[in-house]
């Protein structure tokens, strides 16, 4: 991953180097766990500081990944948002539960619970799959 600090002071770990960062959610969280491991295993204070800054970024911006019926895969600047596939939606839920276990931040628990409820709704699942398919047709 690559560290990117935006104009609002948010610390993002990007999965891909792009001119316009996309903030891929699962990649950010995977990389964040690497920072957490460096902090805990190496007792690295810089890693600890980066972990906390990135957690604050995630807490502040997590609502942007919620489209009111499913999770978004990323925050790209496309007209049509990139909906997560069912696999990645479920991965986001698991990742946020782990983030809650690591940090005790209720924000992570709240979104994991909300997204779990989204996934149990058949209409939401169908809508997400249709939107994901349309996204792929238009952008790939």
Language-model regions, residue ranges each:
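Long, well-ordered core segments of solenoidal/helical folds
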Residues: 1-6, 45-70, 110-127
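Eukaryote-skewed repeat-based solenoidal scaffolds used as protein-protein interaction platforms
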Residues: 1-59
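Carbohydrate-binding/catalytic loop surfaces
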Residues: 4-26, 67-91, 130-140
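A generic structural signal for solvent-exposed, polar alpha-helical segments
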Residues: 18, 36, 76-79, 106, ...
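Well-ordered alpha-helical segments within folded domains of soluble proteins
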Residues: 23-39, 84-101
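Short amphipathic alpha-helical interaction segments
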Residues: 46, 50, 80-91, 104-107
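C-terminal appended segment following the main domain
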Residues: 90-140
């Amino acid at each position: 991953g690559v560290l990117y600090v935006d104009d609002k002071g948010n610390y993002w770990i990007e999965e891909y180097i792009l001119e316009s960062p996309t903030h891929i959610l699962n990649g950010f969280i995977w990389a964040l766990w690497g920072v957490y491991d460096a902090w805990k295993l190496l007792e690295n204070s810089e890693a600890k500081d980066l972990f906390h800054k990135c957690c604050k970024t995630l807490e502040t911006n997590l609502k942007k990944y919620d489209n009111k019926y499913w999770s978004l895969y990323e925050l790209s600047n496309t007209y049509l948002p990139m909906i997560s596939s069912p696999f990645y939606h479920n991965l986001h839920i698991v990742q946020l539960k782990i983030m809650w276990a690591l940090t005790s931040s209720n924000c992570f628990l709240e979104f994991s619970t909300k997204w779990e409820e989204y996934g149990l709704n058949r209409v939401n699942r169908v809508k997400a799959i249709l939107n994901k398919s349309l996204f792929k047709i238009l952008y790939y």
